[in-house]
A protein has these predicted regions:
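Repeated loop/turn-to-beta-strand initiation elements of outer-membrane beta-barrel proteins
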Residues: 25, 57-62, 93-96, 128-132, ...
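Predominantly the C-terminal beta-signal and adjacent terminal strand-loop region
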Residues: 184-234
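Transmembrane beta-strands of outer-membrane beta-barrel pores
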Residues: 33-37, 55, 66-70, 102-106, ...
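Hydrophobic, lipid-facing positions within transmembrane beta-strands of outer-membrane proteins
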Residues: 27, 43-49, 64, 78-84, ...
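Transmembrane beta-strands of outer-membrane beta-barrel proteins
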Residues: 28-32, 48, 61-65, 83, ...
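Residues on the lipid-exposed face of transmembrane beta-strands in outer-membrane beta-barrel proteins
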Residues: 29-33, 47-53, 84-88, 118-122, ...
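Outer-membrane beta-barrel proteins
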Residues: 53-57, 90-92, 121-126, 142-144, ...
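Solvent-exposed loop/turn segments connecting transmembrane beta-strands
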Residues: 35-43, 71-77, 104-112, 146-152, ...
């Protein structure tokens, strides 16, 4: 897991550096933290990083997010999720894509899960205020259980990304994806609203819901996360 995650981090750092030099990439980082003390000592830290380049013939997109919660000095949640997607553009908003994703959540019953898919993507809506992208593809998912055992399965991935510009300073986003496997189905949803504060700085409120249809005994199928973060875009 460490090598895969390190690779994602290095890629994200490299492309973010390239964005500053070439101004061809659009990138953002966001951070949220909550700390309480007294009767209850609790610390929550959330980090997200995104970078994308939309060229004439190809589109690159990379994402990394991390969450760590601790209560009374004991870690209660620690998870990472990252992906990289490359689109090869065809005519009239059509494209072929390949995508590599990796997640690590020691409290999910899995040490890690890695998936690779390739398929077809299309921009379904594109106007001054809203865009809607859809994609579908085939691939494989490899899961490492907490027991050390590994499982591989074929998957079908379906995803939609909707962006609506409410005003010059406010944007609503909705992302939905489902990876349907022969043994289990993993679905993810992110609903967010961001508002510009000043310059490149914005505040974001997001609701994330992750569901795995088949999990080890004693593990919840659905994780819900509500976060308020500051976002810096460059």
């Amino acid at each position: 897991m460490g090598r895969v995650l390190l690779g994602f981090v290095c890629t994200l750092v490299w492309v973010c550096s390239a964005s500053a030099e070439e101004r061809l990439w659009e990138s953002s980082v966001e951070l949220g933290a909550v700390a309480t003390s007294g009767n209850t000592e609790e610390r929550n830290i959330k980090f997200n990083g995104d970078t994308a380049r939309d060229g004439e013939s190809m589109k690159h997109k990379a994402h990394l997010d991390a969450l760590r919660n601790s209560r009374g000095g004991i870690t209660t949640a620690q998870k990472y999720y990252a992906y990289y997607q490359l689109d090869f553009k065809l005519a009239d908003h059509h494209s072929l894509y390949s995508r590599l994703g990796h997640s690590d959540d020691e409290f999910s019953g899995f040490n890690s899960q890695t998936d690779f898919t390739a398929g077809y993507a299309r921009k379904l809506l594109d106007n001054d205020r809203a865009t809607l992208d859809g994609s579908t593809g085939l691939g494989i998912r490899s899961s490492e259980l907490a027991t050390g055992e590994s499982e591989d399965e074929s998957i079908v991935r379906i995803a939609f990304d909707y962006v609506y510009t409410i005003s010059e300073s406010a944007v609503f986003k909705q992302s939905l994806s489902s990876e349907i496997g022969s043994d289990s189905t993993i679905s993810r949803s992110e609903t967010s609203l961001s508002a510009n504060i000043s310059g490149n700085l914005a505040m974001k409120v997001a609701l994330n819901i992750n569901n795995n249809s088949e999990v080890p005994v004693g593990t919840e199928k659905t994780d819900t996360e509500t976060a308020i973060t500051l976002v810096y875009s460059f």
